[in-house]
């Protein structure tokens, strides 16, 4: 009993009407449930159980009507296929070669009427507008059309009653399919009555369809003329004179009448006051329009959504709102900068025009102009072009190889002048002489220091001699006490000794203060140390790659991480079974210290606590094979760093380790270390 989708669509309007009569209101849920029952091929009992929660006591009556309609549609579909051809032929004989009916059917677009529409009590008619338009048909005109059609059918029926059985007509090429006449080539009275009723019903439906089309066209003023022509053609076909309806000119405004004093008056002369529209804020107008739009959305939900199976009318649809835009003020001096930029651009264009004009006069063209010329077409690999792209500017009209003596006019920009391009300095100055530092011996350094001190002493003596500065106090020591002071030392030796020792302490203090002033502070020493460790890597980064068989000892991990941080090295440590790769990046001095750490300072062959028990059980040969060690895989330079701060990465699989290196653009480090590990294991 399952129906196709097309049959379910035709059955849907009838089910909606039946549900509305049974429940008193339309319910899309019941309609959908009924269509599902019919579509799945349920019997009456299952369908009643399925629809009982929705219809309660009216379930059985509704199910009986539903299945009767399905059976009726199925029987009408089988009978329609058998009687379709004979009915078409008989209708043609009843109406003859009446061209008027064919015109009517061609002028109006036919509407397919479902077979379940006969069950409806009242046919649906599209309501027209309240005011009649010139292209619409009134009820009186439709009634006249019906009477004319009935009159024609009665006359044709009377003619058929006196006509003898017609002779078989030859087949015309206009007929698409040959149709056979009934036996005896005669029409029975009951059959003629059936044909007449069908024709009357079709004429009535055609008139209703035309009236609905006229009503729809009347709502569109731009299509009034076409609608009026269709209506007039149908009225002439039915033998009815169409009424003349004048089109009122509603587009013109009401004329303005002014009296002698200039006041606005109506037709009777009474003074009237016109409504003056006051300006309103744009924000208020937008707010009113927004509220009206929200109200319309609430009142009129879309029909497409209601017809959807999954539409829930309880859920409200929030309309999309435009975001508010804030004020954007121009910065001070913005337009002044734009004007200055335009003036500069104009001056530059003027200067370029003068330069190009001078170049045209002299015939000198820069090589950059030729370099900017691109080839006109792309050549495949291995193809030889007819002319090179740098020559295409000189020969714009092409190049003919058959011509023996080409004309001078064929070339562009060829003159007798010789162009001397301007000489440019190379980007890197390689002519600077490299001077090697001169290293002096200890004896030479002392001699140079004495000479410098002697020159400084002579300068002080000259200043004292000229009176620019007071003479310095004699530098008295215990050893030269008697020679410097002389008689004063003999008179009071204790006092002189105290004076000499005070001078010695004073000189010592000044010396220590000078040293303390030159001494760096703690912060300066720290910066100096960091600067010493952080080497210049602008010319390239030195990289070293190490491979360690076992790196499970946390003490060794800490040493690697701590020393890399102290030496300001970057890199990564990838932990994998039997292949632990350590990559470090930095300056040459730091790399030298880290290399000594990895290859000499750390004792890799020391047994760890967690593996000592296992090693005792293994044989000596296996212990030798699995001895832990560190190998320098590769060292070189690169342009930039690939890694950041030193970190440890645990990679259980080889693919995961390679992907980690590939993410930093250094997968070749892993490939090199892994290949060496494989070769070492095979030996």
Swiss-Prot record:
Record keywords, A-Z: Isopeptide bond, mRNA processing, mRNA splicing, Nucleus, Phosphoprotein, Spliceosome, Ubl conjugation
Cellular component GO terms, alphabetical: nuclear speck; nucleus; spliceosomal complex; U4/U6 x U5 tri-snRNP complex
Phosphoprotein recorded as keyword: yes
Modified residues (Phosphoserine): 164, 619
Keyword Ubl conjugation: yes
UniProt crosslink position (Glycyl lysine isopeptide (Lys-Gly) (interchain with G-Cter in SUMO2)): 139, 244, 252
UniProt feature, compositional bias: Basic and acidic residues: 73-107
InterPro entries: Pre-mRNA_splic_Prp3_dom, Prp3, Prp3_C, PWI_dom, PWI_dom_sf
Biological processes, Gene Ontology terms: mRNA splicing, via spliceosome; spliceosomal tri-snRNP complex assembly
Modified residues (Phosphothreonine): 167
Residues of the PWI domain: 1-87
Region (Mediates interaction with SART3): 416-550
Region entry Disordered, spans: 73-135, 153-183
Post-translational modification: Ubiquitinated. Undergoes 'Lys-63'-linked polyubiquitination by PRPF19 and deubiquitination by USP4. 'Lys-63'-linked ubiquitination increases the affinity for PRPF8 and may regulate the assembly of the U4/U6-U5 tri-snRNP complex.
Location(s), subcellular: Nucleus; Nucleus speckle
Assembly and oligomerization: Component of the precatalytic spliceosome (spliceosome B complex). Component of the U4/U6-U5 tri-snRNP complex, a building block of the precatalytic spliceosome (spliceosome B complex). The U4/U6-U5 tri-snRNP complex is composed of the U4, U6 and U5 snRNAs and at least PRPF3, PRPF4, PRPF6, PRPF8, PRPF31, SNRNP200, TXNL4A, SNRNP40, SNRPB, SNRPD1, SNRPD2, SNRPD3, SNRPE, SNRPF, SNRPG, DDX23, CD2BP2, PPIH, SNU13, EFTUD2, SART1 and USP39, plus LSM2, LSM3, LSM4, LSM5, LSM6, LSM7 and LSM8. Interacts directly with PRPF4.
Its job: Plays a role in pre-mRNA splicing as component of the U4/U6-U5 tri-snRNP complex that is involved in spliceosome assembly, and as component of the precatalytic spliceosome (spliceosome B complex).
Identification of the protein by name: U4/U6 small nuclear ribonucleoprotein Prp3
Gene field: PRPF3
